[in-house]
């Protein structure tokens, strides 16, 4: 009986020692959880035109975006933060998914960021306007070539949305077209925010358009309307696609 008591006491002592050893880690975990719960949702406003800065550190890093310039960078541009670099950081924070719904997309830096996310295994889906994706300088052809899913409209109205959803948690939206002209010259705004309700509404809109623009539903030779002729066709990445009156003034640029 005495021996049994000693065994119980020994087991209790070992258990107490292990518990005391694990206590700091448990406390850290609890504090981290409390901080996470108390952390206010993200709210960030970016204004453009953006200062021209070097973005190579952001676009070459394989993982987390570094805070400083890449080692040995000889770029003469400033290496500080700018509206463009903050937008890139918000995009490159994606770990699982990225939905893009954009009217015009020709910025090389933003295009590289999207391709980088695709290479990291992030699921990227893009919705865009059929006319502007066919203009010289558009990033859409490069994204498709990289294997990224792209869908576009085929109607008379513009697909004029300008928003992105990161990991189905962060909404990026505003007046900014993702073009060098808009980034460097135009007065524009971008709102980056974590808000479950707004993200849900924008995600529902994305999914609705994504299904509407399913290629199996395309009509490449729409029926002739009364008193009108068939819309002209334009070469779009090796394919002839119907191009309605909204884009006829752009045909010379394709």
UniProtKB/Swiss-Prot annotation:
Single stranded DNA (ssDNA) hydrolase activity does not depend upon, but is stimulated by the presence of Ca(2+) and Mn(2+). MIGA1 and MIGA2 increase PLD6 self-association affinity and affects the homodimer conformation facilitating its phospholipase activity over the nuclease activity. MYC induces its expression and stimulates its phospholipase activity. Pfam families: PLDc_2. GO terms for cellular component: Golgi apparatus; mitochondrial outer membrane; mitochondrion; nuclear membrane; plasma membrane. Residues 1-9 are mitochondrial intermembrane. Keywords: Cell membrane, Differentiation, Endonuclease, Golgi apparatus, Hydrolase, Lipid degradation, Lipid metabolism, Meiosis, Membrane, Metal-binding, Mitochondrion, Mitochondrion outer membrane, Nuclease, Nucleus, Spermatogenesis, Transmembrane, Transmembrane helix, Zinc, Zinc-finger. A zinc finger (C3H1-type) spans 49-82. Residues 155-182 form the PLD phosphodiesterase domain. It catalyses: a cardiolipin + H2O = a 1,2-diacyl-sn-glycero-3-phospho-(1'-sn-glycerol) + a 1,2-diacyl-sn-glycero-3-phosphate + H(+). It is found in: Mitochondrion outer membrane; Nucleus membrane; Cell membrane; Golgi apparatus. The active site is at residues 160, 162, 167. One of its GO terms (molecular function) is RNA endonuclease activity, producing 5'-phosphomonoesters. Its EC number is 3.1.4.-. GO terms for biological process: lipid catabolic process; meiotic cell cycle; mitochondrial fusion; P granule organization; piRNA processing; spermatid development. Residues 33-254 are cytoplasmic. Homodimer. Interacts with MOV10L1. Interacts with MIGA1 and MIGA2; possibly facilitating homodimer formation. Interacts with GK2. PANTHER family: CARDIOLIPIN HYDROLASE (PTHR43856), MITOCHONDRIAL CARDIOLIPIN HYDROLASE (PTHR43856:SF1). This is Mitochondrial cardiolipin hydrolase. It comes from Canis lupus familiaris. The lineage of its organism: Eukaryota, Metazoa, Chordata, Craniata, Vertebrata. The gene is PLD6.
């Amino acid at each position: 009986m005495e021996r049994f008591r000693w065994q119980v006491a020994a087991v209790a002592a070992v258990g107490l020692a292990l518990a005391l050893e694990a206590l700091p880690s448990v406390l850290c975990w609890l504090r981290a959880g409390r901080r996470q719960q108390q952390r206010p949702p993200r709210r960030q406003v970016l204004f453009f035109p953006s200062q021209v800065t070097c973005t190579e550190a952001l676009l070459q890093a394989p993982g987390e975006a570094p805070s400083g310039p890449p080692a040995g960078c000889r770029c003469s541009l400033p290496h500080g933060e700018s509206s463009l670099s903050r937008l890139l950081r918000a995009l490159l924070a994606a770990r699982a998914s990225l939905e893009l719904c954009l009217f015009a997309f020709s910025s090389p830096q933003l295009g590289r960021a999207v391709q980088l996310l695709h290479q990291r295994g992030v699921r990227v889906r893009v919705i865009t306007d059929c006319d502007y994706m066919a203009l010289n300088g558009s990033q859409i052809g490069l994204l498709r070539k990289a294997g990224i899913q792209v869908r576009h409209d085929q109607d008379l109205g513009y697909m004029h949305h300008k928003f992105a959803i990161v990991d189905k948690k962060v909404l990026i939206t505003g007046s900014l077209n993702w073009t060098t002209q808009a980034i460097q010259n135009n007065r524009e705004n971008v709102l980056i925010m974590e808000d479950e309700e707004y993200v849900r509404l924008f995600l529902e809109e994305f999914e609705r358009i994504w299904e509407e623009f399913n290629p199996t539903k395309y009509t490449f030779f729409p029926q002739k309307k009364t008193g009108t002729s068939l819309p002209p066709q334009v070469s779009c990445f090796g394919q002839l696609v119907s191009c309605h009156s909204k884009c006829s003034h752009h045909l010379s640029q394709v």
